């Protein structure tokens, strides 16, 4: 017996054309809302991680009163909702739900300045190499950076993977046995000397610093964005180091221009490599758009440096040896102004001049910043 069944649907069904976008497009703390005045650097969105910075003096109770303003993809919703105070004394998760039900989870956390670094925690960076089936597999281009520090490792990835200037097993900055637990090992590499849209020097020094490394192929010295926001008056940087100079010191000579550029590594037998550790405090108007780099730090025309100090004894040390860098103040410190601070370690003192010895190795550990009381 044939039957006809009539079905009546209620509500709004999916049509198949709904948006799948489930992104947080902006996350800010507006002035005048809750405890938002404690936020000194607005949130930065990096994938599904969102980080921001508050003043060192910010207490837990204030962190519970921060009120974010959140923008999401069109027709998406977010939970917890925008404009509602959350307890940011710990990590806070937000779930964005797209029109079609697709969900994406974001984690929001605070980044705070530190005065002591033991190099026990390292952050993995994957080159995302894949096999024939598209699965991510380990690669010689993967690397680790010490937590809280920037390194030149991403530049070494280019030298190894794109330019074939260094062997695939070359190490720039990596873990080593430290004075106590782990330390950071910096190695200068033989990068042959060539011209590939930019000058690739004969020797590429490894660098470790407070700040951010953003590859600039037009001028590689501008890749190092030295400095993090700083809210104290640093006086001294202390720590421990070991150093072994490479066998042959080279300088890099460049002639010609454009694709006719010739890059040559010239041995300098009378020179012995040494390491460098520098500390610098400088003034800014904006934390996110201003920095010193490998050019401006050493430029006599730079006028916003407030204090600087350099470790002068970078000779070989076979055992961990204390070092101390005292900052020399060129201008008066004003707590009402904005400052950025960096510690810069290099396996070759003259690396910014494209000079040094392949194989030079610096290991640092237990670095401490002593501030004025």
Locate predicted features.
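Extracellular carbohydrate recognition and processing domains
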Residues: 286-335
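Signal that preferentially marks extracellular ectodomain short beta-strand elements
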Residues: 221-228, 321-333, 350-354
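Residues within well-ordered beta-strands of beta-sheet-rich folds
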Residues: 118, 236-242, 278-280, 324-328, ...
